[in-house]
Every structure is written in C-alpha cells, then in structure tokens.
Amino acid sequence: MRRIAAKAGITPGAIYKHFSGKEDMFEEIFAESGNKLMLLSESMLQTDFTSMTDDQLLQVLYSGISIRTFELLEDDMQLFHMLLKNDSGTYLSRFRKIYIEQCTGFAMQYYSELYKRGLASNQLSEKTVYILSSSEFSMVCEIIADDSCKNGITPECKQAFLEAMNILLHGLEAALGIKKQEEPKHGKN
C-alpha cells in the first residue's frame, strides 16, 4: 500500500481511510474493467447455438472470440498490469474462478451442439474444457504481467498469443474430430 500511495502522491493513511485493505481497493479500481469482461462472458452464455445453421455454428470456432476479448483488454492494460503485479491473489483468484466457469459453460454448450449435429465426432470432458479455459486465462495473464506490456501489448507478445491460439484451435479441431475449415483470419498478420 505504501508503494501505491507513493506512486499516487498520497499517504498510505489516506488509502486506508477510504479502503479497508488492498483487496478492497483493487475491487474498486477494477470494477469497471472486470464488469466489462464479465458482461462479455455472460452474454456469450446466452448464445443460442441451436438456432444457428451448421455453417454459422462452425464459424464460431473460427471467429477469434478469445483474440477479440484479448484486444478488449488493451484499453485497460495499465490497470490489469498493476493488478497482476500487486494483487495478493484474492481479487484475481475470485475473478478468475467466475470468469473461467463462465467460459467453460459457454464452451461446453458449444461443443455439445457441434457433437449433436455430427459436426464433431468426439466430445471433450468438462474437466478438459475447464483446463483449456484456465490455460487460456493464464496465457493472457502472463502477457499482461510481462513488464514489456505494461503500457500496451507489444507486437511480439500479440504475435505469440495469436500463434498459441492457432495451436489451440488446431488441437481442438483434432480432439473434436472436426475437419479443417478455411484458415482463420486472425492468424494472418
């Protein structure tokens, strides 16, 4: 708290007068950015995959949802960098749990619909999807926490993320038994 107060040009007492602790302060600071991500993941859960055509359903896999979400974070990069560098783990852990559960729910609904329609020949367990969602979340956090990205995502880190997401995409195609569709647009820069 002293370091944060010094950077803000105030006394630690001023912070403690307003917030009961660092976690309370982080919750207040990140409320808007966190809510933006939560609203996005909640809206994804409302997607009605049953009303989509087969082509529309397959296009979801190649739409770059994760990449667009990652780009959404760029406006708040300094805040997220500060959170990852200074949080004792409580706020981030709580956020991570909720966000990953929502992403896992979305993915399970999606993969289930692919399988029901015969567009995928295999199903993934919920535990596998949870681990994949956790891995993706960890990749994003790793990039944000990198000191080279504290003022924005560097081209090198963005390219590394795009490549990692393409590897994940092709792994999902193989694991689900989906024949390769046209090359995703987000992998070409």
What are these regions (language model features)?
Residues 114-167, 175-189:
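Hydrophobic/aromatic-rich alpha-helical bundle segments in the mid-to-C-terminal region
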Residues 1-24, 28:
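Helix-turn-helix
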Residues 63, 67, 100-112, 133, ...:
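An amphipathic alpha-helix signature
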Residues 28, 42-75:
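Hydrophobic alpha-helical connector segments
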Residues 83-100, 156-175:
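C-terminal/domain-terminus segments
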Residues 71-75, 89-117, 127-134:
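Amphipathic alpha-helical packing segments from all-alpha helical-bundle domains
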Residues 1, 31-38, 42-45:
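Short, basic, alpha-helical segments at the C-terminal edge of helix-turn-helix-like DNA-binding modules
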